[in-house]
Each structure stands twice: as C-alpha cells, then as structure tokens.
Amino acid sequence: MSELLRARSQSSERGNDQESSQPVGSVIVQEPTEEKRQEEEPPTDNQGIAPSGEIENQAVPAFQGPDMEAFQQELALLKIEDEPGDGPDVREGIMPTFDLTKVLEAGDAQP
C-alpha cells in the first residue's frame, strides 16, 4: 500500500498529470503466524510484584562510595530550596516603594 502511495506522490511531485509509467505491484499484507503471535506477547505473570501489590526491588544496585555522598548533599540542598521562604539569592534590605500618583503623572507628561 505504501508503494502505491509513494509512486502516486512522486508522479504528482514531478508535475505530470498522467499516472506513472512504472507498474505498481500489489502489496500483500501477511498476518503473523500463531507461533509468532505467541512469541510477541509479553509474559502474563506478574514478575516483581508481591501478592500484596507492592513492587519488589530485585535487581536494584545500592548506592555506595563517593557517589552516594554527593547524592545526599545534592538532595539536602534541594530540600532547603523547596522550603517556603526566601531563597539564597534574595538580598536583604528594604524594597523601594513607588508612589502611584507620581508614576502616573510622569507617564502623562509629554516630551
């Protein structure tokens, strides 16, 4: 089917109003045999799931060494940043206040 569509789209790209002079063969779609269907189906047993419904960690490697220490430090920083309040990049001081009447008057003035 895709060959038929490809041949027609190529002939229209060339600007020819005539059908392509190349013969287009029929496309045969083959259904997979019963053996192949069985091979393609995923296993139906629930591997890694305990009867209680919890997922078992069978092949999860444990963190060890300097990577674990770096991971813990990064995790601690993330926890600090996620807490409500000011972050480390907030400067202490008084924020400037704007008098809206002065701002509006300045906007009305024409140069």
Swiss-Prot record:
Pfam short name (any one): GAGE
Domain of life (superkingdom): Eukaryota
Listed SMART domains: GAGE
Compositionally biased spans, kind Polar residues: 8-24
Region annotated Disordered, chain positions: 1-66
Family: Belongs to the GAGE family.
Protein name in UniProt: P antigen family member 2
Organism (species): Homo sapiens (Human)
